[in-house]
């Protein structure tokens, strides 16, 4: 198990570096004479027509609705594996990261709403600081190598996966609108087909892919966010075949490099380009960016630590073996790395609002995530034993 986790984290570390490069490249383009080219590229109309089906969207939305559906497929596969066989497969294992994740979502959301009280437009962004970027957080931890106890790595992995599950629920409940009955009916039929494949023990991935594509189109047209189709598909793919092989894990391993080295960097490049030319100090300290940044920097660690402490004191959970509060605290700070997940929620929260709100949300996310990453890394490095000790 330790070797598998190390392999996973080493890939996350490399992907995290590429993510950072994509963000820097996007910011440079958005604040240079190339800004027109950058915005024009993302606004390029892309149309797909098959018979009566016509999907017509700018490139940015193809990235956010299409590529990110594959990322959520990967998240769904990870969640299912951890629930059935991994770090969340028993109450004892799942209790502490579950309480930590709940606190890590509620407190940042509360801080954001505190700064945006009374404004119905900006209040829509309450879930932005509630997210944790699993790839980036694990990548930062991976930089510390084998100094990090395996139990601490598993705790962060489990917490981040539960956080992702919370984000999925939030998207389904709060960021769906103008629902289409016909599209939802088609989606329901596709889901029944996927469940039927699972129940019959079909392990070939092609039938799941065909029905999954139909489901994605139906969900895209339904008013429910299309990324949720990826999660549904993941939950329907069998974890184990009769011969002991795992179609789910095979697909998960195949998707990981695509996610780390293509999907997430492309998403970051498309969404992180914030033009700073017209922004003043007053703008940076306005309710949206300050609420998000403080939610990530302060809300995440406070929420994770507070709910974890209460759960342990009430004997509802216990600390992992060989892990103390001094090690949990910097990991809680790392949970403030919202990055791609926070930017994704921002794109949903302010989709119909003035583009300025989206820029402010992305800026708050970048500032908060960057500070959380620095604090978490140096804090954890300080409390862990030195190499060779």
Swiss-Prot record:
One of its GO terms (cellular component) is plasma membrane. It catalyses: Na(+)(in) + 2 H(+)(out) = Na(+)(out) + 2 H(+)(in). Its main location: membrane. It holds the Pfam family Na_H_antiport_1. The chain crosses the membrane at residues 14-34, 59-79, 95-115, 124-144, 154-174, 177-197, 213-233, 261-281, 290-310, 328-348, 363-383. InterPro entries: Na/H_antiporter_dom_sf, NhaA. GO terms for molecular function: sodium:proton antiporter activity. Disulfide bonds: none annotated. Keywords: Antiport, Cell inner membrane, Cell membrane, Ion transport, Membrane, Sodium, Sodium transport, Transmembrane, Transmembrane helix, Transport. GO terms for biological process: regulation of pH. It is found in: Cell inner membrane. It is a multi-pass membrane protein. Belongs to the NhaA Na(+)/H(+) (TC 2.A.33) antiporter family. Na(+)/H(+) antiporter that extrudes sodium in exchange for external protons. NCBIfam families: NhaA (TIGR00773), PRK09560.1 (NF007111), PRK09561.1 (NF007112). This is Na(+)/H(+) antiporter NhaA. The gene is nhaA.
